[in-house]
Amino acid sequence: MINDRIKMLREQYNYSQADLAKKLNIARTSVLAWENQTSDPAMKHIIALAKLFRVSTDYLLEIDDKRTLSLEGLSDEEISILCDLLNYFDKERTT
């Protein structure tokens, strides 16, 4: 469920609930409610979460389990570094 994805991504980014709430300009209790499955985020918050975590809205909503990473806003140098890291991890898995 989206609630689990929000918590997982928040933890992967090492954000507290308060950190995430501040980034979204909402109350910490809203993040708590999402993660506890007592409410679901509005579409504008789903879009904001997807942008913040650089994933698709489909991934957040569990329509698609493929986790894609948005490179929007990254410089060519940053993209090159990411590609080098991915290649390194691919080689490590195969050796």
Language-model segments: which ranges?
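A short, Lys/Arg-rich alpha-helix, primarily the initiator
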Residues: 1-12
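Conserved amphipathic alpha-helical interaction elements at protein-protein interfaces in regulatory
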Residues: 12, 52-55, 88-91
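Short alpha-helical DNA-recognition segment
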Residues: 14-36, 48
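DNA major-groove recognition helix of helix-turn-helix/homeodomain DNA-binding modules
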Residues: 24-25, 42-59
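DNA major-groove recognition helix of helix-turn-helix
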Residues: 35, 45, 61-64
